[in-house]
Amino acid sequence: MTLIPIVVEQTSRGERAYDIYSRLVKERIIFVTGPIEDNMASVIVAQLLFLESENPDKDICMYINSPGGVVTAGLSIYDTMQYINPDVSTLCIGQAASMGSLLLAAGTKGKRYSLPHSRIMIHQPSGGYHGQATDIEIHANEILRVKKKLNQIYEKHTGNSLKKIEGMMERDKFMDPEEARKIGLIDRVIAERTDIEIENIKVKQKVG
């Protein structure tokens, strides 16, 4: 069993204890860690919606360290990221594979980052089904439909052609952060927090 650290905070009403992840949510930081499945996705979606209700104009930062997981669970997080008003900055720590890489790429353009020793992997969806031939055909067609949809999402967020995406997704494609940047999955490789701060200043200067 993993022990989650508790943070004790002094307030005007006395001491208040938070688990470390809840305390970070107060700072608008969300963690997507471990396999992506329905229960975890529901928590992430709830956090995104809560932070939007708290302040619809302030960025949310999503840290990702995930091997991927269930496509429908991942897409529920993806759709919520696109649905809410705040920009969602994504940062890969460790790895972002499969659905994890899709969520990494789905961050707000210009605010998608990776730490230098992380690993990113993309591939086509997989699945299996046992049963009657007709049912197997139905599920095979569904996997192909999902594959097409995922390719279209990568196309939208990376700027690559659908044909190029299909080629890259044909087999497991492992990348270091710089390779991921070159194909548009992320915008920048960062080593220190100040790298993001400098980037934000540059963006503000361009807007101004």
Swiss-Prot record:
SUPFAM superfamilies in alphabetical order: ClpP/crotonase
Task: Give one GO term, molecular function aspect.
Answer: serine-type endopeptidase activity
- NCBIfam families to which the protein is assigned, alphabetical: clpP (TIGR00493), PRK00277.1 (NF001368), PRK12553.1 (NF009205)
Organism classification: Bacteria, Pseudomonadati, Pseudomonadota, Alphaproteobacteria, Rickettsiales
Question: From what superkingdom does this record's organism come?
Answer: Bacteria
The protein's Enzyme Commission number: 3.4.21.92
Location in the cell reads:
Cytoplasm
Query: What's any GO biological process attached to this entry?
Result: protein quality control for misfolded or incompletely synthesized proteins
- The protein in question is named ATP-dependent Clp protease proteolytic subunit
**The organism of origin for this protein:** Wolbachia sp. subsp. Drosophila simulans (strain wRi)
Q: Which family does it belong to?
A: Belongs to the peptidase S14 family.
